[in-house]
From Swiss-Prot:
GO terms for biological process: pyrimidine nucleotide metabolic process. Coiled coil: none annotated. InterPro entries: Cytidylate_kin (IPR003136), Cytidylate_kinase_dom (IPR011994), P-loop_NTPase (IPR027417). The gene is cmk. Belongs to the cytidylate kinase family. Type 1 subfamily. This is Cytidylate kinase. The keyword RNA-binding does not apply. One of its GO terms (molecular function) is dCMP kinase activity. Keywords: ATP-binding, Cytoplasm, Kinase, Nucleotide-binding, Transferase. Disulfide bonds: none annotated. It is found in: Cytoplasm.
Length: 223
């Protein structure tokens, strides 16, 4: 039964390293990996491609149901995301896509449409689920729960370095403002607001290296 499959949820705001840590932990454990944020970004991209009005909830919900999302691992180990059979990985990573996804994610009907799809990732031997409400809404019965945090300034700095490496010119101050605005949207939305589960392990990654965070998370599962 699916509910007997172990699940590790790693929640937290943007830029705390959820994705990086989750992928490493999933690989070490040999478990499946769910990037829930990619699903919302995929819906955002599909909505943009088909000119869906984000204020039209009915159209957005239909888009969420109709959008086909597949994760394909390349020979180099990198995960590519296909949206309706089109490789949209690079588009999904754009800041504008993230902002649109955050707006869409605040709509309860869209979250409901994607809930079952996320739960279907729960397969043997186990699942590492990365998101904002994995431990509180999607997998409230998960055996292991982590909530990652980090100061907004540090998260902006990390994102700035990532974008600079890719040759994307951006202002650090603008990134910081965007992160704070997204935090406010995520924490204040009426449906599935961003918050740690009562039984989650809290980890502040502000002054930590990735391997240190990974070690703490793995210890939760293996000890």
């Amino acid at each position: 039964m699916a509910d007997l499959v172990p699940v590790l949820t790693i929640d937290g705001p943007s830029g705390v390293g959820k994705g990086t840590v989750s992928k490493i932990v999933a690989a070490r454990l040999g478990w499946h990996y769910l990037d829930s944020g990619a699903l919302y970004r995929a819906v955002a991209v599909a909505a943009d491609w088909t000119a869906v009005d984000v204020s039209d909830t009915t159209a957005l919900v239909k888009c969420a149901f109709d959008t086909c999302v597949n994760f394909a691992k390349c020979a180099d180990g990198e995960m590519r995301v296909l949206v309706n059979a089109i490789d949209a990985t690079d588009v999904l990573r754009m800041e504008t896509t993230g902002v649109l996804a955050s707006t869409i994610a605040a709509i309860s009907e869209v979250r409901a449409a994607l809930k079952e799809r996320q739960q279907m990732f729960r397969r043997t031997p186990g699942l590492v689920a990365d998101g904002r409400d994995m431990g509180t809404v999607i997998f409230p019965d998960a055996q292991y729960k982590v909530f990652l945090t980090a100061k907004a300034e540090e998260r902006a700095q990390r994102r700035y370095k990532q974008l600079m490496k890719k040759g994307v010119s951006v202002m650090l101050g603008a990134l910081l403002e965007e992160i704070r605005a997204r935090d406010a949207r995520d924490a204040c939305r009426s449906v599935a607001p961003l918050k740690p589960a009562d039984d989650a392990l809290l980890i502040d990654s502000t002054c930590m290296e990735v391997d240190e965070v990974v070690a703490q998370v793995l210890a939760l599962v293996t000890d």
